[in-house]
Each structure stands twice: as structure tokens, then as C-alpha cells.
Amino acid sequence: MLMLVMSNNFMQLFFGWEAVGLASYLLIGFWFPRPSAAFANLKAFLVNRVGDFGFLIGIAAVFYWCGSLDYAEVFANTHLIDGKSFEPWAGASWSIPTFIGIWLFIGAMGKSAQVPLHVWLPDSMEGPTPISALIHAATMVTAGIFMVARMSPIYELSETALAFVLFIGATTAFFTGLIGIVQNDIKRVVAYSTLSQLGYMTVALGVSAYSAAIFHLMTHAFFKALLFLGAGSVIIGMHHQQDMRRMGGLRKYMPITHITMWIGTLALVGTPFFSGYFSKDSIILAAQAAAGQGGWVQMYAYWAVLLGVFVTSVYSFRLLYLTFFGPERFREVHEAHAGHDVHEGHDTHAHEPHESPAVVTMPLVLLAIASLGIGFFTVGPMLFGDFFAGAIRVLPEHDTLAAVAQAIWHDEHGWVSAAVGFGLHFIASPVFWLAFAGFALTTYIYLFNPSLADRIRSAAAWPVRVLENKYGFDDLWIKGLAGGSVRLGQRL
């Protein structure tokens, strides 16, 4: 990751890019005797090779038309490709910046798990939970977001490439979040949440709010690592049970995990003054500014990220309520096991949930502190200051964050009062009220009328099947493309 981030040329970037992919492959398959882990790491490896093929084409195109792989030289020579086109065949004219931008972004689609190259990330949960927290939520999986932001001088030359990035990001943000609502594995709920939040970052890139994308990347690293490690703590306390339907009532057994996961969830849904509020709200406001002066793609993206707030709230509070509230459903499972094992002296007390040791809970507390305050203290320089001066280039006509700053950032009396004013903006923002609606609905269903969840599931059987089938993307990749390749090879 350090090589990837610190590189000053495309070649070194590519080596770092591939090295973190190798690390991901090896760590997903850490428990290699498990067939599911072996399949998951192979799936991640192959899907990312599809993205990396596009990334290589993009790098080759940069070298061909700019004559260098050094960032400084390439960005200084963008005038060589600005407004230029080429003919791949007679009568066809393709924009060079668009060609480069789309191929580079295909690499980001693989690394940062954007539709349709997202299918590997949920399966990466087969790896150890700290790995899920570190590289599949906080660092490696966001490398594609970093890369596109770093290449902003190229993307600013092509509105078509930006629109492509925006459409893919909006689709990922909304539709993968919906899948999280029907998941029962606690780690997979957080995994689909990660997919959705990566979509939000990509939307920020597509509306030229590169600083907002990196800002959300940073705040997301804290609260999503907290949620993953919190899920790991629950799994430890539940003796490696991951099905939320077999949990319930854990708040009295795991108080530290319970409180810290509440903090992570409140940051994720964008609760005012929590870290996620500042970064997510800035992305949605930037998308709104782009929708006001753009076309149907910009309008689609704005509504996708806006409605995604409600979806995020629903699956997040569903996870909390199924895990920490309600009846202690794990007792039914343990009693059933005790009945089967009565002749073997089975001890039901051995399965009693318990709080995780300090080596697990201390990182939760530290991440919870950051999830509370990091956004408030960094929103000024990262979004509206000169923190990225010289590293990110935005054309004046694309500067959606300027419109956001004009609307909500008033630092005449210092950054503290400006950050407080940004925090108080929630009163007039639909984002807060959508998140609150999701909270209220989920609270009513899972705390006061649990049978309603089953009735809704039965009434919406067809949409639920579509979501449980993940829109058929796994079938497309495994049975269609991979299976088709195998059949073709057999015939040849």
C-alpha cells in the first residue's frame, strides 16, 4: 500500500497495485483447507485480473499518447490529449481522454469492487475478520478510489469518462446496499455496506468532488473497521456463530462491543456531528450540485445516493437489533444441541455468550473515538482548505465542492464555528430525515413488531429472491463467463 500511495509513476503504481492484490488473495485463503475459502480467493484473484487488464490498457494508452509514465510529465502534457481523438477504424472517432479514463477506471472497478466487478468482495469475508477490517474495508479496497483521484488531471478532460464513473458508482451505492437488507451473516451485512460506501466515494469522483471522495475514504476507514472488528468480537463471543438469526439480547453479555458498534453505526448512517455525517453529506450535496447543472446521469446519481441513505439506515439498525436486542435466540440452538448430546454430558454453559478480551475490545474503543470526532476536526482542511493543493486538479466548471462551500461552509469566525454550522445543517437536509425514517421503521419492526418482518418478506417474495440471488451476478460470472470459457476450452 505504501508503494501504491507514494509512487510518482504509473509503473511503480502498477507494482504496488498488483502486490496488494496478491496480499488480498493470500489472506482471503488464509484458512486454505476450507473449500469456501479456496474458492473465494480464486474468485477474487480472477475478477481482479479482469479489472487489471483494463488498467494495463489505460497505462499503455497514457504512455503511447503522453510519452511518459511519470506523473509530473503526464500531467504537464495533458494538453497533448485535451480535445484530441483517434480512429480505431475508418469512420470511428474516439476521444483520447475518454479512452484512457474509462480503461483506467475499469482497473478501479475491480480493485474497489464496483458493479459488475464487485462479486469478489462479499466472498472475501472467508478470510480472518481483522483482514476484512484492514484491507477489505479501510485500505486496499479503496485503492481504486485513490487512483482515480490521483489521476484527476486526466479525468477532468473528459465529461464522458466522469459520467461513466458516476453511473457505475451510483448503481453500486444503491443496489448493493439493498442486498445488505436481506443478508443474515453479520460479516456479509458489513461487506455489502462496504460495497455501498465505495459506491458513494465513486459518485464523488464522478462529480469531480475528489476531495470529498478521499475525505469519505478516510472517515469510512475508521467506522467500517470498527464495525468489522465489532462483528468479529460478536463472532468470538458467540463461539463462531455468524448468523444473526441465532443471536439476540447480546447487549447485556457484550457491553463494550454493543456500545462501540452503536457508535460505528451512527457514523455510518450519517448522524449529525459523527465523522460519517460530514463526509457523506458533502458527497450528496456535491451530487445535488451536479444534478442541478447536468443531465440524466447526474440526476440518477443524486437520487441513488439520497435513497441509499434510507437503505443504509435500514440494514445498519437491523444488524444492531437482531444482534443485541430481542429474545436470546441462541438459547434455542444450544438447548437443541444439549438435547442431542445429553448422553455425552453436553454443557450448555460452555456456549454462554461473553465479552471479548481486552486485546479485541481496546481497538474497538480507539476506533469509536475516531469515528466520533475525526470528521469534525478534518472537514475544514480536507474539503474546503488547501490540503490537496497541487495533488488534485478540478476545472472551475466542474467544481461542485465550491457550490457546497458556498451553501454550508462559513468560516469567517474560524473553522470551529464553520464545522458546527455544517453539523447544524442537518435540520434542513433530507439526508438526516431519510436516515431517521430508516431508523424509525427498523426500530418499529424489530423491537415492537418482529412478526412484521416475516410478513413483509413473504409479501415481497420475488424482490427478496432477486436480492438473495444478488441480481444474478454470481451466475453471470460463474456459470456464464467462467463456465462458458471451460466449455469452449473443452470443445477446442
Feature names for model-found ranges:
Residues 297-310, 352-367, 371, 424-427, ...:
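Polynucleotide-recognition surfaces of large bacterial nucleic-acid defense/processing enzymes
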Residues 380-434, 444-492:
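Aromatic-capped, Gly/Pro-kinked transmembrane alpha-helices
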Residues 1-16, 22-350, 376:
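Hydrophobic transmembrane alpha-helices and their helix-loop junctions in integral membrane proteins
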Residues 51, 257, 349-369, 473, ...:
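Loop-to-transmembrane boundary segments
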